[in-house]
Amino acid sequence: MIKNSLVAFVFGTLCAFSSFAQELNCTVEVNSSSVEGTSTEVFRSLQQSMSEYLNEQQWTNTVFSPNERIECRMFLTVKEYKDDKVKGELQVQLSRPVYNSSYTTTLLNFKDTKVEFNYRDGDRLVFNENSWEDNLTGILNYYAYLFLAMDFDSFSPNGGQPYYDKAAGVVQMAQSSGEIGWRTFEDNRNRSAVLSSFTDSNTGMIRDLLYQYHRKGLDEMVTSADKGRAAITESLKALEKIYDNAPMSVALTMFRDSKLDELVNVYSKAPQSEREEVFELLKKLYPTDLERINKIRTPEE
């Protein structure tokens, strides 16, 4: 009886520990509505496999409690499925809670248009950190590490460095595989370019922005709106530096797609001089988004 109780206790403890190990809470959705003549079962299987792979894998040595898991989303739109090969687009989103509030802020909202991989119904996805398995697990590994890197950066200065390094390892292996979406000079919005926007010295100040904007800015606004907003205003100056160094950097696009609408709310109660300052900064960077940016200068009543 004592032995059985001890076994039950140890097993329960191990189960409890494993439930604390996973870092990601990632919602995965696969949309195959544009594909005809293929059973939807393969796409249901793909969705489940992707979800289990991301959410059940232990990606770090850091212990996360359930309420600390990183919220992310992946929406795969399948454009073509032929000879077990999937071609499509992947929308990835990453969010984080703001301290002492119910508000959740978006860290990343990015569409990857260069997604191709082989998948058959029931294929098992195998994690291997040190060697290349296939393009699907490579893509999932890359975004898992990018999610971790950006999340850690938003809480501490350069806190995400180990995970940018891991993402770089994935990119290096992928480039040897010959798969699309990874090559350095393929285009300025692929996975290699996205990673470089965080690690290249010309654009790496986007990482400082992640910390200043979120930890010193949004997290502080709950207790002092003026102090937090001032930190956000200061953080935006990093965008000017990026623009001056690399005006076509995907870092600028990623910031726009995740933050422009939020900034309208951030500055809704700011002094007019502060709103004007931010408006002037952003209109230089995003001249085609003046209608949205103008709402910062002239908030709707």
Give a label for each model feature.
Residues G159-L252:
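Flexible, glycine-rich surface segments
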Residues Q22-K87, V98-N100:
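Start-of-domain marker
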Residues M1-E23:
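Bacterial Sec-dependent N-terminal signal peptides
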